[in-house]
């Protein structure tokens, strides 16, 4: 039975088999849900790479009674992704032998993340989802939901992501993985009985954060300013004499290292590298055109990580485009998490459109 009190709930889903042929035993998926569940009013939110199931914390002001995602009308559910570290089975979780999975944890794809979530819903008796909404990695999962299990969802909203990982994205994401693997405490992923690779994950976050924010925003905030009380222009290089932007990025890295597991970061980043909606489906455009679920697309005009042209590509090729929206912001990729006024307006528009969708018409399209 679905728990809708907003508390973190841990649900065992049994063994899980990845699409590449690996087995995870006795998997747990954690989730949180808010609002009264009627069986037909479920909205599923898909979090980004280092997010979690507590959607109210990362979309504060958008979820609740009378808000864009109205808990008086809908039940809002968000899982912690398989491979994560916030309650779901991941590299830090116990293997059947009692030790952490560590290096034995298998590689995952975006499709695996979706299928694990589907397995959770099967255990909870959920067979109808009004809408699935996700940004960044959550957007990739939303897109795969529409390709893998269209019969379960009425509509979807895909935000700030592409149809597949680009070579640039794979390159920048692999650099982050390398930063973690080069930390001497990484130990091939088997570090849970000792010192965690905090320096590695902090460095990975510094790289990633520059892709999450806009170049204009970063430059306007920091420019070439020195960190208060420091001088980066001295006669000799000193890592303790920093530019302000360096201090800011180091702070972002430390914050993530304190709350997120490096093993999960590697597994989920690799899953993003494997993202390709066209794999095994005749290529990108054929796969997109075969999606009959009505999908709304949104992107950020200054996004470096998933440039807006990638959302335009989705909009041109999806088999059933519901609508398109642009988030205008100097912030860059993270704007879908920070531009709350724009996101509220866009989400309300999406919900209005979703309520007007004729399920019987979509069923005819699928035949």
UniProtKB/Swiss-Prot annotation:
UniProt main location, coarse: cytoplasm
Disulfide bonds: none
One Pfam entry name: Abhydrolase_1
Localization (cell): Cytoplasm
Positions that bind substrate: 205, 334
Domain of life assignment: Bacteria
Domain named AB hydrolase-1: residues: 41-339
UniProt-listed Enzyme Commission number(s): 2.3.1.31
Catalytic activity as recorded in UniProt: L-homoserine + acetyl-CoA = O-acetyl-L-homoserine + CoA
Keyword NADP annotated: no
InterPro entries the record matches: AB_hydrolase_1 (IPR000073), AB_hydrolase_fold (IPR029058), HAT_MetX-like (IPR008220)
Gene Ontology terms: cellular component: cytoplasm
Keywords in alphabetical order: Acyltransferase, Amino-acid biosynthesis, Cytoplasm, Methionine biosynthesis, Transferase
The keyword Amino-acid biosynthesis belongs to this UniProt entry's keyword annotation: yes
Gene Ontology terms for molecular function: homoserine O-acetyltransferase activity
Biological-process GO terms, alphabetical: homoserine metabolic process; methionine biosynthetic process
Entry annotation: catalytic residues: 136 (nucleophile), 303, 333
Pathway(s) of this molecule: Amino-acid biosynthesis; L-methionine biosynthesis via de novo pathway; O-acetyl-L-homoserine from L-homoserine: step 1/1
PANTHER family xrefs: HOMOSERINE O-ACETYLTRANSFERASE
Protein family membership: Belongs to the AB hydrolase superfamily. MetX family.
Assembly notes: Homodimer.
Purpose: Transfers an acetyl group from acetyl-CoA to L-homoserine, forming acetyl-L-homoserine.
Protein name: Homoserine O-acetyltransferase
Origin species: Corynebacterium diphtheriae (strain ATCC 700971 / NCTC 13129 / Biotype gravis)
Annotated gene: metXA
